């Protein structure tokens, strides 16, 4: 038996889950927020208890020390030596990493170099990896890449219709993201349907603050909505999703607050989407409250959101030449029945029909009617478990 920590580190946060492996039992989980800011918050959940501390945590190394000390302090482990592996979620692996890998100095350097593809994510992941390697140098660290699952896309799918020199010289192409989530829910969908994954055509919709849709053919990603960066695709919580690229120079010319392309991209990443259009929030619960109040901006934001998701799902029916099931996952995908209802309502031509009661009352599993030609599934994603499994598989290979 061994204990494995799955880590999802952001620029100012560190989310974690401790597993007993190979039993896949969750022993504890938590998050450290506001790293590098005043009044950082460390939350630990274990044995039905919740412990919260407000501290000043200056960097990721300090955050990791606090996490490990908390595990001992709360009696979750007796010593650091009980931990036999650490797995790290890394958003961008580019073309370098087609599967999960054991971390070494070269791998860490390459992850930092790939930050250009995920500037909001890779630097935080690298900081988390470095912190664990400094504090637990003898423990195997494994990187699990969001992009790895999408390396099965064909060249005509991942290349953009621009001169090929930009791919050859600068590796500009579609990489995708959320691959670990899409892989996991596809595997779970096959179990739920009682059919081999290798026989299924699935559309998986990861709808959280970030949104990505993937076309899965016989267990492999053949297309996905996120692109060169996670900014592409349908509308998201704070991200615009796809826009006409000519808007970028136009806004620089017109708006004195936007001085260069970086300013515009920052606006598209952090101040757009549901939040930017509604002026209320990036949280679908707040948007739905606005719908109840007939707030016109909330209504507009919601309608754009539904429209963009329907269009993306529809195009993947064409890519796959039909589908056996549509899978909803992640925060909104799992917990926003109105959103699911309105998305499916616009796709009824494809033969989808959902059971209203199962949809509304938080049912996990098949929410479609018996007559539905395409099954509609709600599956809770578990990226942390996928990470822990890869650590278990790779920890003796370094």
From Swiss-Prot:
GO molecular function: acetate kinase activity; ATP binding; magnesium ion binding
InterPro entries for the chain: Ac/propionate_kinase, Aliphatic_acid_kin_short-chain, Aliphatic_acid_kinase_CS, ATPase_NBD
Active site residues according to the UniProt entry: 146 (proton donor/acceptor)
UniProt keyword annotation of Transport present: no
GO BP terms in the entry: acetate metabolic process; acetyl-CoA biosynthetic process
Note on cofactor: Mg(2+). Can also accept Mn(2+).
Pathway membership, UniProt: Metabolic intermediate biosynthesis; acetyl-CoA biosynthesis; acetyl-CoA from acetate: step 1/2
GO cellular component, one term: cytoplasm
Compartment(s) of residence: Cytoplasm
Cofactor(s) needed: Mg(2+); Mn(2+)
Family to which the UniProt record says this protein belongs: Belongs to the acetokinase family.
HAMAP family noted in UniProt: Acetate_kinase
Quaternary context: Homodimer.
Protein known as: Acetate kinase
The species this protein was found in: Streptococcus pyogenes serotype M49 (strain NZ131)
